[in-house]
Amino acid sequence: MTLAGQTIAVIDYGMGNLRSVSKALEHVAGGKQVIVTADPAVVAAAERVVFPGQGAMPDCMRELDARGLRTAVLAAAKDKPFLGICVGEQMLFEHSDEGNVPALGVFAGNVKRFPDEKMHLPTGERLKVPHMGWNEVRQKPHALWSGIADGSRFYFVHSYFVEPADLALVTGICEYGVPFTCAVGRDNIFAVQFHPEKSARDGLQLLKNFVEWQP
């Protein structure tokens, strides 16, 4: 029987590419078991928790509540090593302009859409939304960047980004028409807008750092 201290729970609320996330985690798990789960009890028993997400924010919030997982997510965010990915990062904030919906409110701040009037290069060439593809991340000090060079490229697919009220949360910045926050961290929580599971060696290194992290 697997001990709780050996498990990494990947929260399944029907809105993420969970196979890619779980396979990447298994690659770096070092003997810990990766469990994809919609069971709040399994989330509560896990040593650490990964909260992925993709799709529209209103759908993500609705599905999270429909599966009775809100309380489990909020509890895990208080006291376990916790990694949010993509919409899983956005849902940690108070509100999203996508559908004008309230989110979980773990962090103060909002989720904003890329501003159309800023979506161009200095040459005048238009930038497409969603922001899709590889882009450089400028780091701010955090244990989860260990072994990853500043300016490394990660894979993004998104039209919205977080705007924290407290800039001390910001652990990574990217630029696409405008500079935007692409990673946040506080205490036991680290969350990223990009997809580490799709980001080759550096993405796997970040996941490995999370698996080993003792905040």
UniProtKB/Swiss-Prot annotation:
The record's listing under CDD domains reads: GATase1_IGP_Synthase
Show where the Glutamine amidotransferase type-1 domain sits.
7-215
EC number(s) from the headed UniProt entry: 4.3.2.10, 3.5.1.2
Pathway recorded for this protein:
Amino-acid biosynthesis; L-histidine biosynthesis; L-histidine from 5-phospho-alpha-D-ribose 1-diphosphate: step 5/9
Q: Where are the catalytic residues?
A: C86 (nucleophile), H195, E197
UniProt cross-references to PANTHER family, sorted A to Z: IMIDAZOLE GLYCEROL PHOSPHATE SYNTHASE SUBUNIT HISH, IMIDAZOLE GLYCEROL PHOSPHATE SYNTHASE SUBUNIT HISH 1
Designated name of the protein = Imidazole glycerol phosphate synthase subunit HisH
Say which species the protein is native to: Dechloromonas aromatica (strain RCB)
